[in-house]
């Protein structure tokens, strides 16, 4: 395993002057980079990747250097230490990997066009210009770009443009910043712009394949988010502008480049006349996440990648804080509970999972750090826990001090805890180290022993696990006055239970509000007490009850069969939050039945009973003045009713398709994917399939594209599935950025499992060549592990991936995913009969 050598230890750059001449036609790039900095050694190293170095001068004299492609480095011998200026001339090419400098392709009126953009996080700035490509190596940047320019085209960067000279567009010098946050783009763009109260210019940019009104929502959210953060952080936005740019080809979801934030089109643009509340929520949280980074990540940056959580966890929490302030009616924390909290609790219960704060031993491991369920979701839950513990006043005071102390510099997690701890007068660091530096989380067992109410913590596992006597300082958030704020010991006796119950006059509960990262296992007496009064619980507390029971069943601490009879009572809810968790649990039952079996017929009947009343109440059409919950619930219950083969719901979907066949994009966005999928599954033909696939290629509406992908991958026709799989490597049909969704859709289809699994094994090298530099590459393995559930597939998975265990960046993912499948296979074997019997009993 190659250890990472930190180039910053020998050379501290202070400024860069970068001139780039780029041709879209030939894909050639000619560059000159001048770096001034402080050499601490006579032998320094500069990062480069795939650059052809033509000349390197040191203080104006020909330099002594060697290029080391394996180390992605230029080794430079200097005549002396101290201040030095390097001038490096080089050539390279536009990449085709969505990393470095690369073209995006799109169509306007049948004409293919190119928009060139960049993606430099984590270590791809070195593909664009020689640099010390490490977060700590902050410097200023003077950028000039020349390209094969056509009239009306726009060029953007982190800072405003100052002049055009000899075809080069010059930009204002940046503030001191990290290389991975540099960005630029050029092409035929449209924009809408406004200003914040403090005078920051805010703009949204997109290709002209989109309607102008698709930019409006993002512009409004971006402007108000910046204003919110300036107030919340008590720290001004530090740049003259904040551009939001939608790129047609983009491997990540979005990227927080300072002053020029880049996004997938699906996460920035939406049609205000036909969208869903959930789409608005997702787009708003993505924008708020990236803009939170402009302070937390950009102004103050982690010192090294092992503190990546410091950037991502904080932005993940703040996106919800901001959107909740901007759109309080949305109840956005409910989205956090169902997406972030659930993902973190599931992933973090597998033995071998990374901790939030994790060491990086190999350069290839940096991208593998971006584990959404841990670094983003669990980390955000840790910070939500801190916020609940110290309150917003101390949080804001601490952040203001943190930004003032470290602005334009770097920081570690300890710096943040120190600032927050001083503001709150609490030992935040001591509490948080137990959560950030060790993986996993506890289950707190609450039981009545010899008349006393006793709490006990132990590490919770889904599957086999080595507990290692880990212990946490747990914010208990109990609803009895006698419960301390923190559980700091393994066990705690709260005293006589009946006395406690009589005094408090309510069922005993822990983690009220579900803001702490643990689950609770109540003994039967305590659980029955809660369930007897379950309708009095808030929606979040009902979700938590279902969520904890589900996880306990996944961990074999209780049986899924015990949960089945509870589900019908939760089906009566009017809460979208509870409904979403209800169907999460109900969908988990599908693994216990074989497709087309008599057991699945019974499960479908159970789904029918769960969804019958709400589907009838909500119907396919939105009612005037209906609640946000009704809007969000409609697709959930209709999807369940379609799985149940509810004849009325299926017929209504077919009728809606026929009535709107000539204008499918105009179907209400909330139900469109269900209507089209139902048609493909039950009334499809090769002609319809071909037509929808053509529509997928033609449309620039990301939401409609997603709907078509979901529908087409659900076809029951094996020949049509095989046609789809043949298009996986055809970027004219399926862009590499979208391939994972298509692969997952086909693999999840019982008819498609064989073709998709064969394809990825046969074409693994192609996949690695195409998206191997992408931080999402390893998630193809996660997708497979999320679906496979038979001993045969487990054996095939191990046979294919175990030889790849030594691949840096894949080791942890493969190891964990083998455990995930093993655990699921064992759970099905143990629980199948009991679950099927419970379902049969529930529908009698």
Language model region names:
Residues 72-74, 258, 672-673:
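Short glycine-rich loop/turn motifs
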Residues 103-105, 156-163, 185-190, 276-279, ...:
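Short intrinsically disordered coil segments
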């Amino acid at each position: 395993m190659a250890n990472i050598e930190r180039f910053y230890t020998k050379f501290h750059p202070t400024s860069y002057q970068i001139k780039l001449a780029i041709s879209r036609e030939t894909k050639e790039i000619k560059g000159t980079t001048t770096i001034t900095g402080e050499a601490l050694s006579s032998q320094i190293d500069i990062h480069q990747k795939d650059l052809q170095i033509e000349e390197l001068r040191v203080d104006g004299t020909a330099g002594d250097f060697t290029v080391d492609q394996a180390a992605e480095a230029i080794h430079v011998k200097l005549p002396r230490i101290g201040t030095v200026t390097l001038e490096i001339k080089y050539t390279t090419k536009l990449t085709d990997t969505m990393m470095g400098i690369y073209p995006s392709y799109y169509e306007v009126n049948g004409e293919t066009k190119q928009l060139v953009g960049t993606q430099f996080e984590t270590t791809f700035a070195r593909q664009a210009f020689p640099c010390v490509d490490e977060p700590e190596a902050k410097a200023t940047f003077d950028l000039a770009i020349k390209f094969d320019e056509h009239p009306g085209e726009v060029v953007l960067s982190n800072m405003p443009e100052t002049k055009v000279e000899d075809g080069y567009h010059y930009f204002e010098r940046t503030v001191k910043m990290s290389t991975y946050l540099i960005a630029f783009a050029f092409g035929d763009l449209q924009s809408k712009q406004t200003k914040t109260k403090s005078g920051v210019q805010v703009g949204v940019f997109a290709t002209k394949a989109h309607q102008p009104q698709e930019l409006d929502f993002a512009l409004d959210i971006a402007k108000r988010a910046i204003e919110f953060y300036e107030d919340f952080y008590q720290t001004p936005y530090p740049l003259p502008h904040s551009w939001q740019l939608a790129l047609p080809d983009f491997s990540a979801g979005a990227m927080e480049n300072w002053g020029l934030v880049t996004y997938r089109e699906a996460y920035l643009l939406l049609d205000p006349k036909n969208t869903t509340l959930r789409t608005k929520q997702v787009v708003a949280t993505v924008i708020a996440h990236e803009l939170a980074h402009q302070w937390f990540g950009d102004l103050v940056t982690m010192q090294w990648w092992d503190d990546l959580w410091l950037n991502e966890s904080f932005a993940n929490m703040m996106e919800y804080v901001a959107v909740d302030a901007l759109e309080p009616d949305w109840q956005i924390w409910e989205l956090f509970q169902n997406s972030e909290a659930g993902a973190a609790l599931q992933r973090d219960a597998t033995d071998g999972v990374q901790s939030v704060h994790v060491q990086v031993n190999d350069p290839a491991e940096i991208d593998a750090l971006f584990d959404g369920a841990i670094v983003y979701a669990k980390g955000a839950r840790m910070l939500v826990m801190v916020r609940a513990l110290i309150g917003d006043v101390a949080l804001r005071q601490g952040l203001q001090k943190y930004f003032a102390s470290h602005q334009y510099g770097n920081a570690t997690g300890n710096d943040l805890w120190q600032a927050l701890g001083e503001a709150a007068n609490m030992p935040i660091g001591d509490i948080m180290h137990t959560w950030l530096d060790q993986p996993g989380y506890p289950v707190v067992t609450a039981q009545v022993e010899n008349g006393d109410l006793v709490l006990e913590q132990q590490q919770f596992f889904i599957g086999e696990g080595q507990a290692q006597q880990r212990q946490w300082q747990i914010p208990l958030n109990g609803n009895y006055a006698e419960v301390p704020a923190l559980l700091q010991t393994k066990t705690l006796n709260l005293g006589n239970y009946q006395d406690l119950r009589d005094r408090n006059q309510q069922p005993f509960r822990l983690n009220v509000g579900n803001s702490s990262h643990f689950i609770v296992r109540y003994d039967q007496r305590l659980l029955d007490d809660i369930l007897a009064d379950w309708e009095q619980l808030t929606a979040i507390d009902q979700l938590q009850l279902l969520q904890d029971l589900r996880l306990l069943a996944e961990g074999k601490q209780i049986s899924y069969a015990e949960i089945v009879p509870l589900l019908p009572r939760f089906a009566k809810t009017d809460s979208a939050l509870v409904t979403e968790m209800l169907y999460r649990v109900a969908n988990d039952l599908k693994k216990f039945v074989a497709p087309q079996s008599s057991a699945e017929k019974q499960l479908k009947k159970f789904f029918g009973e769960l969804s019958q009343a709400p589907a009838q109440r909500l119907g396919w059409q939105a009612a005037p003045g209906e609640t946000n919950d009704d809007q969000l619930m409609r697709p959930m219950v209709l999807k369940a009713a379609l799985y149940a083969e509810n004849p009325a719901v299926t017929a209504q979907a077919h009728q809606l398709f026929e009535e709107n066949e000539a204008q499918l994009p105009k179907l209400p966005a909330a139900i469109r994917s269900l209507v089209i999928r139902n048609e493909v599954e039950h009334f499809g033909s090769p002609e319809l399939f071909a037509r929808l696939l053509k529509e997928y290629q033609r449309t620039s509406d990301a939401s409609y594209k997603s709907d078509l992908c979901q529908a087409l991958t659900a076809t029951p026709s094996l020949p049509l599935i095989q046609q789809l799989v043949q298009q996986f490597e055809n970027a004219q049909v399926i862009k590499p950025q979208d391939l994972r969704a298509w692969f997952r859709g086909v693999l999840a289809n019982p008819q498609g499992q064989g073709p998709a699994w064969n394809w990825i094994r046969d074409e693994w090298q192609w996949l690695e060549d195409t998206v191997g530099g992408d931080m999402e590459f390893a998630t193809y393995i996660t997708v497979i592990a999320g679906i496979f559930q038979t001993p045969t597939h487990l054996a095939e998975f191990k046979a294919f991936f175990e030889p790849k265990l030594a691949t840096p960046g894949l080791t942890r993912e493969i190891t964990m995913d083998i455990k995930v499948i093993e655990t699921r296979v064992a759970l099905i074997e143990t629980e199948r009969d009991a679950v099927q019997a419970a379902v049969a009993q529930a529908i009698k």
